Curated annotation (Swiss-Prot):
Protein's name according to its UniProt entry: Filamentous growth regulator 23
Localisation: Cell membrane
Glycosylated residues (UniProt): 382, 397, 475, 490, 506, 539, 565, 591, 637, 687, 739, 831, 957, 966, 1070
Single GO biological process annotation from the record: cellular response to starvation
Protein source organism: Candida albicans (strain SC5314 / ATCC MYA-2876) (Yeast)
Keyword tags: Cell adhesion, Cell membrane, Glycoprotein, GPI-anchor, Lipoprotein, Membrane, Signal
Membrane topology category: Lipid-anchor; GPI-anchor
Upregulation: Induced in biofilms and by alpha factor. Repressed by HAP43.
Signal peptide: 1-21
Propeptide: 1090-1114
Superkingdom classification of source: Eukaryota
Gene name of the record: FGR23
Length: 1114
């Protein structure tokens, strides 16, 4: 649209009449008259067929101070068929135009007749990506004046040839917890236009050949799924029901050809029809499209069903006639090139020498993700491009991306997240999991009395990882323009070459996470200037064009606060509580900003009677205002042409989510002998690091050698219904100023979408824990196994009605950064419906721990998620962690069935299947550090011990070796010596002792606890780190247990905007080799009754005392 509008402006400028007086040559005056056009048109374009209908067009001309009215009626029909090995391409263009011009002042008539020429071309090439489009149009214009009759003939031949499209298979690189996928695409497009004009016996032939070679390399970080904490009995709901933004496809540019992957051969006796698919993202997983071929006269059924009482099944059957449908979509498109040129000729029929005027406009428009201000343009022949950035997390993670380009250049992106605290504690992952996320507190049924009721809280926490992964996109395009103009036998050849390289980085933006009523986020992207120098052989002149774009985005998010149930312990029942966690990120694009809102639904079972009645309505209202200012300047010789375009897009998105949760009864049984459980609540600020470790010690006064606890929970059917309505209004205001003229027009797009999602999960969980101790030898053995099977039937119905859609989206969700969808597609007026169903989800996890004289640790986890849906992939992931090796594998299979019937009779259907199996990757990380400290000084004051330590030197060496297909990649980082950093450390200790007895119906149990609080403050020149460590030793009936909790608070570095609360787990294996466990953002919530811990009269003063002392010290 922008290119065509630019051509119209240039055409108007060229046709500005001169100031000479009106002579008797009426033909010259008529040709140089400014025509004001007021037209309305309705068009529909697709690869299958194309129809264009133009309504009445009125031309108003000042012909001797009288009105001149010109009426034009025309229709145009184009058919295009993809070329195959035995099929030819037939392009037919039919145009009928009739022009009648009546002058009031003198006898002046003008008529225009058009004749169409049909041409066909055939080729014997077997390349499926070879397309010929040829059309010839001849228009004859006859003008009759009182003195002369002039006949003008225009013949235009358009030849559109797509020669080569190469799609190289994707490459995957797995480094630790991240997976990078590289897609390489190369395409060559040749467009040849022949324009023959005959005006008054003078013939002019203009030939233009445009060759575009685009090489694209896209590096993305795909799905990381989400981090899940399993507590033993929970209702597992993956975040697939989150509100999603409405993605509106954009019309395809004239020189952009969708990818055609030659994965299977098409029978030579069938016809291949190229379909254009409309992509709407409905899940939180990345989707890759490829080509699937369906044989002729075959029936492809697709059915899916679920298991459980609440069953939702859908069976769809597709029948194809004697044609093979070939549908493809280029999912990794991040930019598209639009080449356009305009020719304006003005020729007089006088007796003077024939003159010709030629005006050229060459526009290259690129739509991609935002250009980071710190991105650097590097030549392809350089060896490496290194980009560093610091993120807001406080743990140390190493990730690297290796890019292998055909020109033997390396691009390595290292992301280093500094840690401002040092943790040297040994953490038992399984014990920490039980103590922090499994507050199951119960005693034998014989000890239950009315004064000390039992409270059972089984919770599930599903939190998405914010990995701050970036998608780096490198585009290299080469354009060659060859023009040949022949005027009366004189031939002039113009040659223009252009080489453009774009390096863009999709920068992660922190998501607002708050419960306030209104959140306003303003993002101002720095001005991105792209200067392209075109070297043109045109009589020695040089054309220099400069484009400047400025983007400013304002996002306003409005949502209602969370509704919380009030707990009651009067009766032993169960209910469900729904909590919503909203995270949003504005993704800046060239013309319109999309708002991604993800919602995580957690189900918590408690003995409660809520005020919400199981109904919570959440409304998101986002207003995205994007203003783009483009300044286009062309300097040639002494002339300068400057055009300023201002585009303001105001998009309003209203998402209303109304989940209805039907609670059901649940059964809970516990059989145990002499057990104790403790639940601890830690309250931290948003910039804190929580580290927990649990150490169990046994005394010789143990009465039982074996302790076995079994918890079995079976949750019946739970129905969840979510009605989601999305309303999107986009208003675009275009303002173009060229020289002295200004043009303004506005477009408005309204899109309403309603989704109804019904989820019926059934969960069966079994948790078995055993503990064996020996009185003579300090050895312990604990094991746990969790087997959970969820059957979920998820039916999604999407109905979309839209009048006009024109957008290119780059979707980068903030919650997991896993979903980076870069797509460009076209759509038509009509309706669309999509159905989604999920069959089952299975999850299993196991962990074992064995402790003796030498400390050895091993853990294994297995996660299997099986799903069958339209747009959700099946994921199977296994992670085994031993002493120094890790193996990760990922397999994704996606099947999409889509039907899009329209009111105009045009329909497109696609069956897409994609299988992505990354390469085997092994990675090893070794890190060594050494620190030298000066002697410490101690002083005692009021019972508190203060220690001051001054550090002198610190060295750190980190080496990482990654093996991909027997190819090793070594990344080594060495931190130099710090001389005299002047770091002071202050340690203060305090001890609290509590003792008492617990009386039950039959016995009296003594209990005592000792709490030692250590405060460590480390101050440097710019930051201060405060660490509070609480060591709690409690004894119940001569069984002693020691628990250590540590809270570290540190201000964020100056580069960070905000910090987050993270739960960090680390393991020390053989006291030398670390095993890195991913850091997950988990909000800690304490729910339970202190009486169930065995404390008499609800004496939880030790918990309150610890937290109060910690807060006072902070």
């Amino acid at each position: 649209m922008f290119a065509s509008y630019l051509l119209l402006v240039l055409w108007i400028i060229r046709l500005v009449p001169t100031t000479h007086a009106h002579t008797g040559n009426d033909a010259e005056y008529l040709l140089n008259t400014v025509l004001k056009r007021d037209a309305t048109s309705l068009s529909r374009n697709a690869y299958l067929d194309s129809e264009a209908t133009s309504g009445a067009t009125n031309y108003c001309s000042d012909c001797d101070n009288d009105e001149v009215i010109v009426t034009v009626d025309g229709t145009s029909t184009i058919w295009t068929i993809l070329l195959d090995s035995t099929i030819s391409t037939l392009v037919t263009t039919t145009s009928t135009e009739k022009t009648t011009l009546t002058s009031c002042g003198q006898s002046c008539t003008k008529s225009k007749d058009a004749s169409s020429v049909s041409s066909s071309s055939a080729s014997s090439s077997t390349s499926r990506s070879l397309i010929f489009r040829t059309s010839t149009k001849t228009v004859t214009d006859t003008t009759t004046l009182p003195t002369v009759t002039e006949i003008n003939t225009f013949t235009t031949t358009d030849s559109h040839i797509v020669l080569v499209y190469t799609d190289i298979n994707s490459e995957s690189t797995i480094t630790g917890d991240y997976t990078f996928i590289k897609n390489k695409n190369t395409r060559t497009v040749i467009i040849t236009d022949y324009v023959t004009s005959t005006v008054g016996g003078e013939t002019q032939i203009v030939t233009q050949t445009t060759t575009s070679v685009v090489y694209e390399l896209v590096v993305t970080c795909p799905d990381h799924d989400f981090a899940t904490t399993l507590t033993g009995s929970e209702t597992f709901v993956p975040p697939t029901t989150a509100p999603k933004p409405v993605e509106t496809p954009s019309p395809e540019p004239s020189t952009t050809i969708l990818s055609i992957k030659s994965e299977s051969s098409v029978p030579s006796a069938t016809t291949s029809v190229l379909d254009t698919s409309i992509t709407l993202e409905t899940s939180s997983s990345s989707i890759e499209f490829s080509t699937s071929t369906q044989e002729s006269s075959s029936i492809g059924p697709s059915s899916s069903s679920s298991i459980g009482s609440c069953t939702s099944s859908s069976i769809s059957t597709e029948e194809s006639l004697s044609t093979t449908k070939l549908s493809s979509s280029f999912t990794s498109i991040s930019s598209w090139e639009e080449l356009s040129s305009s020719f304006t000729q003005s020729t007089t029929s006088s007796n003077a020498e024939p003159s010709s005027s030629f005006a050229e406009s060459f526009t290259t428009e690129s739509l991609s993700s935002t250009i980071e201000a710190t991105s650097s343009m590097e030549d392809i022949s350089n060896n490496s491009v290194l980009t560093s950035s610091i993120f807001s997390e406080t743990t140390t993670n190493e990730s690297s991306s290796y890019t292998d380009e055909p020109s033997s250049s390396e691009e390595i992106t290292n992301t280093y997240e500094p840690s401002s605290s040092t943790e040297s504690s040994t953490t038992d992952q399984f014990s920490s999991l039980l103590s922090s996320s499994l507050p199951v507190t119960s005693t034998s049924s014989t000890t239950i009395s009315s004064a000390t009721p039992i409270t059972t809280v089984l919770s599930t926490s599903i939190t998405s990882q914010d990995t701050n992964c970036e998608a780096t996109i490198t585009n290299i395009s080469t354009n060659t323009l060859i023009e040949t103009i022949t005027v009366n036998g004189n031939t002039t050849i113009y040659t223009e070459t252009q080489l453009s390289t774009y390096l863009t980085s999709n920068t992660s933006i922190n998501c607002p996470n708050t419960n306030s009523a209104t959140t306003t986020t303003t993002q101002v992207i720095p001005t991105a200037t792209t200067e392209q120098i075109h070297t043109t052989t045109l009589n020695g002149s040089i054309i220099v064009s400069t484009e400047t774009a400025t983007l400013k985005t304002t996002v306003i998010i409005t949502h209602c606060p969370e509704c919380t149930n009030e707990s009651s312990t009067s009766e032993y029942s169960s209910s469900l509580k729904a909590e919503s966690s909203q995270q949003s990120i504005p993704t800046i694009e060239s013309n319109l900003s999309e708002l991604s809102v993800s919602s995580t639904l957690s189900l918590v079972e408690s003995t409660a009677s809520g005020k919400c009645s199981g109904l919570t309505t959440t409304t998101f209202t986002s207003i995205v205002s994007t203003t783009t200012e483009s300044i286009y300047t062309i300097t040639s010789n002494e002339s300068t042409f400057e055009m300023t375009t201002t585009v303001t897009n105001i998009g309003t998105i209203v998402i209303t989510t109304c989940p209805t949760i039907t609670p059901v009864s649940s059964s809970y049984s516990s059989s145990e002998s002499l057990s104790s459980s403790v639940s601890t609540s830690l309250l931290t600020e948003s910039n804190s690091t929580i580290s927990q470790s649990t150490v169990s010690t046994d005394k010789s006064s143990l009465t039982n050698d074996n302790q076995i606890s079994t918890v079995s929970t079976e949750t019946p059917l739970t129905s969840i219904t979510i009605i989601e309505t999305t309303s999107k209004t986009t208003e675009s205001l275009y303002t173009t100023t060229s020289n002295d003229s200004t043009h303004i027009f506005t477009t408005t797009i309204i899109d309403v979408q309603t989704n109804t999602i019904v989820t019926c999960p059934t969960t069966t969980s079994t948790l078995t824990s055993s503990h064996t101790s020996d009185n003579e030898k300090p050895a312990s053995l604990s094991s746990s196994s969790l087997i959970e099977s969820d059957h979920i039937a998820d039916g999604t119905t999407t109905s979309t009605t839209f009048q006009s859609t024109s957008t290119t989206t780059v979707d980068h969700h903030c919650s997991s950064c896993s979903e980076i969808l870069l797509s460009t597609s076209s759509s038509i007026i009509g309706n669309k419906s999509t159905s989604t169903s999920i069959s089952s989800i299975e999850t299993s996890a196991s962990s074992s721990y064995h402790s003796s004289e030498p400390e050895v640790m091993s853990s294994s986890s297995s996660t299997s998620i099986k799903q069958s849906s339209d747009s959700i992939p099946s994921t199977s992931q296994t992670h085994v962690s031993t002493t120094s090796s890790s193996v990760s594998s990922l397999e994704t299979t996606t099947t999409t069935t889509e039907n899009s019937p329209t009111s105009n009779g045009f329909s497109s259907s696609s069956i897409v299947t994609s299988v992505n199996v990354p390469d085997y990757v092994s990675s090893s990380v070794s890190s060594t550090s050494s620190t030298t400290s000066s002697p410490s000084t101690e002083s005692s004051s009021n019972g508190l011990v203060s220690t001051v330590t001054e550090s002198s030197t610190a060295n750190e060496n980190t080496s990482e070796i990654t093996t991909i297909d027997n190819t090793s990649i070594t990344s080594e980082k060495v931190t130099g010596t710090n001389s005299n950093p002047k770091t002071s450390e202050i340690i203060k200790d305090a001890t609290i002792t509590t003792s008492g007895n617990v009386e039950s119906l039959h016995s009296t149990t003594p209990i005592s606890s000792t709490s030692i609080i250590s405060t460590n403050a480390i101050s440097s020149s710019d930051t201060t780190t405060l660490t509070i460590t609480n060591t709690l030793t409690y004894s119940i009936d001569s069984i002693t247990t020691m628990k250590t909790s540590s809270i570290t608070t540190a201000p964020p570095p100056p580069q960070q905007k905000e910090s987050s609360s993270v739960l960090s787990s680390s393991l020390i294996i053989n006291s030398s080799t670390p095993t890195i466990i991913p850091t997950i953002n988990i909000p800690i919530t304490f729910e339970g009754n202190a009486n169930s811990l065995g404390l008499k009269n609800g004496d939880n003063s030790w918990i309150i005392g610890i937290m109060m002392i910690g807060l006072l010290m902070i």
